[in-house]
């Protein structure tokens, strides 16, 4: 973390977390809930949980439009999808300067997780599939 601290110019208002090793679930939960924005800038990503977890906790997300991320979060629903570092910086700045936008995205993101990714929805999908297969 020393390199990150040096890169931030020792700005006390800038907090960079690059390695969460040794940090427990309670702390990660607190970080995600208390953050104004979560950044998931991946160049390759499966269906990682960071994006969905942040949306469920009503925190807006700025994330790379790659891999499974767009399946979790449509642009403007939970956060902003980006393709470059410059777009990432602009999106973060936009959210920090417009907290109302962040709240709108966060609300939409939580609802998206509720609709598509929680256990009751997955069970309903399974039951519908079984019904279709069995012809009932």
Question: Where are the model-predicted features located?
Answer:
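A short alpha->beta transition loop at the rim of the catalytic pocket in nucleotide-sugar-dependent
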Residues: 36, 58, 65
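Short hydrophobic beta-strand element within catalytic cores of glycosyltransferases
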Residues: 60-63, 73
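A short, well-ordered alpha-helix in the C-terminal region of glycosyltransferases
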Residues: 101-115, 122-128, 132
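Nucleotide-activated donor-binding/catalytic signature segment of Leloir-type glycosyltransferases, i.e.
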Residues: 1-30
């Amino acid at each position: 973390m020393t390199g990150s601290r040096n890169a931030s110019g020792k700005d006390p208002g800038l907090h960079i977390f690059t390695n969460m090793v040794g940090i427990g679930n309670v702390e990660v939960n607190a970080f995600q809930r208390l953050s104004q924005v979560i950044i998931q800038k991946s160049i390759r990503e499966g269906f990682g949980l960071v994006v969905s977890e942040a949306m469920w906790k009503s925190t807006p997300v700025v994330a790379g439009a790659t891999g499974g991320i767009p399946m979790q979060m449509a642009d403007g629903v939970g956060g902003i999808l980006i393709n470059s570092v410059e777009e990432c910086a602009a999106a973060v700045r936009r959210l920090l300067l417009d907290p109302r936008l962040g709240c709108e995205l966060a609300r939409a993101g939580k609802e998206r997780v509720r609709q598509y990714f929680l256990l009751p929805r997955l069970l309903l999908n399974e039951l519908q599939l079984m019904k279709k297969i069995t012809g009932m």
